Amino acid sequence: MSPKVNRYSEKIILAPMVRINTLPMRLLALEYGADLVYSEEIVDHKLIKCRRIINEKLGTVDFFDTEDKVAFQTCSAEKDKVILQIGTADPGRALKAAKLFEQDVSGIDVNMGCPKGFSLKGGMGAALLTNPELVYEILSTLTNNLSVPVTCKIRCLPSLEKTLELVKIIQSTGVSAVAVHGRTKDERTQHKNRNDYIREISRYLTIPVIANGGSGEINCYEDIEKFRRETEASSVMIARSPESNCSIFRKDGLLPLEEVIVDYLKYSIKCDSGLHNVKYCVQRMMGSYQATTRGQACIRANSVRDICNLYNLADYYDSFYEDSNPDRFLDNL
């Protein structure tokens, strides 16, 4: 098995989630035991306009978009673990985007499963499922011109036969693995995941298959292995479970939610994350607890420090910005 293929074999992976999978959450997942972490999907149009800046104050590499906002941030602690997911419908543009980030990530993934209107209208995401010629062009262009592994994440087609035809084409492009969400583009979380489809795909292909879509039945670490066995996949990718409690990756069991939020906030401080992203992630973790006094205070928070103060981290936040604090650099993780 080649090193590129082996990278995706027998792994537990943090699935790409919009607004969730920024650097703090990826680092938290790795700390708790995830083997690989995906970025949120970023569209190629945005990526090709980014400026790469080495942030010596934080020990990060920051990619700024045309509005001077950080579109992607990474650091040495995740260098061999982070996969950049690209939204694209054009081989040339996909390659141009991937080349800009190639030196800073462990792999490139093409989103071929997003069912949202924005992706479909742009010919991206799940729209690619019924355009196998373009799928071949995009993936072949990337595998033939990048030094890092290339993968894609798909959804099932309505019939197993059509799905197998598609993954055969995907494998022929030289990709290192394929992640399969066991639902069609028209199905949602209330629909049963097609574990039988993933199982047949796993038997059909020679490259690693990454099973996805089973988070609704994954409530503890042992459930991850149960999902892998049921699908006979090489690896498992989970989303909703770690979104609620990222310590799902711990072999030793789940941590109390408050402890997880504290750990997340510490990484957010070290990454100098913005209020909107931090608040969004904390609220997603809190779930129904947003109705509590602390939850309502989080909603009203006007700064990251305000949120930190709710978890007795105000002093930690303040000390981070002291020049004498050696722990302020992510290189010291």
What is each of the regions a protein language model found here?
Residues M1-V18, L23-P24, E31, E137-S147, ...:
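Alpha/beta catalytic cores of nucleotide-metabolism and tRNA/nucleoside-modifying enzymes
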Residues S2-N6, M17-L100:
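Glycine-rich, positively charged N-terminal anion/phosphate-binding segment
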Residues M17-R19, I42-D44, G87-A89, G113-P115, ...:
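Active-site beta-loop-alpha junctions enriched in small/polar residues
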Residues S39, G107-P115, S172-R183, S235-P242:
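Non-cysteine beta-strand/loop elements that form the S-adenosyl-L-methionine
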Residues E56, D80, G117-V135, R183-N195, ...:
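Glycine-rich tight-turn/loop motif centered on a GG-T
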Residues D62-V150, R155-Q171:
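Active-site beta->alpha loop and helix N-cap motifs at the rims of alpha/beta catalytic domains
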